[in-house]
Amino acid sequence: IFSQVDNELVELEEIVLTIPFDQTVGKSILKVDKLNFDNVNPIIAQYMMNSISKLPGVSSITTGPGIGKPSIRGLSFNRVVVIDQGIRLENQQWGEEHGLAISSSGVESVEVVKGPLYVLYGSDAMGGVIYIEPEKYTSECCALIDYTGIYNSNYNGFTNNLGLKGSSGKLSWTFRGEMTDNGDFSSPDGEVENTWFKNNELKSGIQYQTEK
């Protein structure tokens, strides 16, 4: 026989589980797959999803030239979260024509988080999280210049990418521009009409360090 003389209320302390959106794989406790764009063929790296789909469990839903929607372990649309420089992007979840509207220009690496710890990023990250890490500022005292030119014979198109970055004292800066001009896609039966596309983009940033 069990009896209880007094009613006792036990209140447990609240537990809060958080994770910063700007935390990269080097500081994370999560299982993360990482792709460094330094090791990717520039032709493949032209389109972000072409590169990310090389990672295990990641594929691309493609409905036409330049359109690629991420799919992680079969889940996509509003089941995949994309974070660029700590900011959630809300431009690819809806229709199948809404691809990942991010160029690989100026991107240093991409990290993909999969598994049950997606709950740290919210219920809409059930498929996983794609974290995009931009190229780092340089600590060199002078300006650094790089250029990449690509010719696509199938589209009879060109891509020109120019980057400038440098540092002076505690101040660092970066600038990158890219221009893409592709014609209609060529198939064995001839050109496919209305598959041409153009893209112009500009990225810039400035950083000031209080200690250096």
List where the protein language model places each region:
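Short acidic/polar hinge/loop motifs at secondary-structure boundaries
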Residues: 71, 87-116
